[in-house]
Regions:
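Conserved active-site neighborhood of enzyme catalytic/cofactor-binding cores
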Residues: 2-6, 29, 104, 116, ...
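Residue patterns forming the tRNA-binding/recognition surfaces of aminoacyl-tRNA synthetases
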Residues: 1-148, 244
């Protein structure tokens, strides 16, 4: 048996053993049907009920009280439970060496502060989760079809709200597992069944990491872009090196295989 996810080591062992995950807690913080007689209970209530049940069955040998650190949410101070959910990711682990090479072409001011970036990159071991379950931000331009086995991607360059709009006719339909393009939505829509729009939004840094591309005219003014990119300078604080700077360099490397800036002032 492997305990529920508590840290990176739990995830690593779970994957190494090839175990099949299951979800015992739902998004409302209640136990799922997998908990049997404790289904529907809040987590704290279920823990108390399990102890009472084991005591009734005479299966508790000894109870020892110990102090324990419990992670809580920043604002509500409520206990945090890790729940396994499907999210959208951008691949990044495969390109770390190339980002380091490209960072070598950037002049950092002062030079020693480049180490903030390199230290952060040493700790990257998973891909970048870019989807968030929030109410307000840039919507992820995706719809699900054919009982979730296919995804519909909006064409480049437009803004859509999938939770309230239908896919444009020239959207691409992809197999969800293989990511292979099947065809255009306009031609396939009669065979796709119910269409469900994505309700999740992008991580804020997914937008912010476009800043150097946007100001340089990427995709809109390519003549200007050829002259203006890499952007001359990025001035910023050290506390967002791991987010704003790193994700901007990541996106520049993934899209263009170029350094995002000529100078970085931290």
């Amino acid at each position: 048996m492997v305990c529920s996810f508590g840290d990176q080591n739990d995830v690593a062992v779970f994957r190494e053993l090839g175990l099949t995950p299951f979800q015992a807690i739902d998004l409302d913080g209640c136990m799922t049907n997998i908990a049997g007689p404790f289904a529907g209970m809040k987590v704290a209530e279920a823990r108390k009920s399990v102890i009472e049940f084991l005591e009734t069955e005479g299966k508790i040998h000894q109870i020892i009280e110990k102090e324990q650190e419990v992670p809580v949410s920043e604002r509500g101070k409520n206990p945090v439970e890790i729940i396994l959910l499907k999210e959208w990711y951008v691949r990044q682990t495969h390109i770390q060496d190339r980002i380091r090479e490209l960072a070598g072409d950037i002049e950092f001011h002062p030079p020693r502060n480049k180490q903030f970036l390199l230290d952060w990159m040493e700790n990257i071991s998973i891909d970048w989760p870019i989807s968030r379950r929030r109410w307000y931000h840039t919507e992820i331009p995706i719809w699900y079809a054919d009982e979730g086995t296919k995804v519909i991607c909006a064409p480049s360059g437009i803004y859509v709200q999938p939770w309230r709009q239908s896919p444009p006719e020239n959207s691409e339909v992809l197999d969800r597992e293989t990511r292979k393009i099947i065809g255009l939505y306009g031609k396939l829509k009669d065979d796709l069944g119910e269409i469900v729009g994505e309700e999740k939004v992008f991580d804020t840094w997914m937008d912010s990491s476009n800043s150097n591309l946007f100001v340089s005219g990427y995709l809109n003014e390519m003549d200007t872009f050829e002259k203006a990119f890499p952007t001359a300078i990025r001035p910023q604080g050290k506390e967002i090196v791991r987010t704003w700077l790193y994700y901007t360099l990541l996106k520049s490397a993934l899209l263009l295989d170029k350094p995002g800036f000529k100078h970085v002032w931290i």
